[in-house]
Amino acid sequence: MLALLIAAASQITVYAQVEFTATRDAFQKSYIQEATGDYTGAINALKEVYDEKSYELNLRLGWLTYLSGGFTESKAYYLRAISLMPYAIESRLGFVYPAAAIGNWSEVIAQYEKILEIAPNYSLALHRLGLIYYGRNEFEKALKYFEKVVNLFPFDYDGLTMLAWTHFKLNNMREAKVLFQKALPNTPGGSSALEGLQLIK
């Protein structure tokens, strides 16, 4: 009986090693094919070893199907990855790409807000939410996100200029001018900050 158990355990170990090697090789093949623009080949390489319970496979397939233009399929892979690891940020950031590509901005906003629940100071989500609301002319909403970005990164050119433009749109010209000026030591030839200062004169 003991000999049978040892043999079974040994067989499982060998199978797991073979499975690991096949998965690793499939990932490597997918990276090579992605680099050449063969997204279909990259996807097929991973589908040969696909396991719906694998976070990594779902994450990678979400990216590759997005690149190939399969936005609905991409969202499904990313959602599966999110369900497997709900506190992971990278899968939520990935989901945003196909959602934005099909114009589903409510889903984009929901994912960024969820990221901020998980990591309240995640500057990329803060900045992108600010950009979305700025683009919608919802400047008061944009303001709170850009303010937080600048508080976290006071010398960041993009954060400073977007906060400056938001103040400009809200007719807070003094604040806008100060922020445009603060942005220029970072990027002395920054066209956005220079344009803003020119408009305020």
Spell out what each predicted region is.
Residues 1-11:
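Bacterial N-terminal signal peptides
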Residues 20, 169-201:
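Terminal, low-structured helical/coil segments at or just beyond the last alpha-helical repeat
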Residues 22-51, 56, 60-67, 97-100:
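Alpha-helical segment of the N-proximal tetratricopeptide repeat
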Residues 23, 55-57, 89-90, 123-124, ...:
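Helix-start (N-cap) detector for alpha-helical repeat units in TPR-like alpha-solenoids
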Residues 35-44, 68-80, 101-114, 135-148, ...:
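Structural signature of tandem alpha-helical TPR/SEL1-like repeats
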Residues 50-52, 84, 118, 152, ...:
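Structural marker of alpha-solenoid helical repeat scaffolds
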Residues 55-104:
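Mid-chain, structured segments of secreted extracytoplasmic proteins
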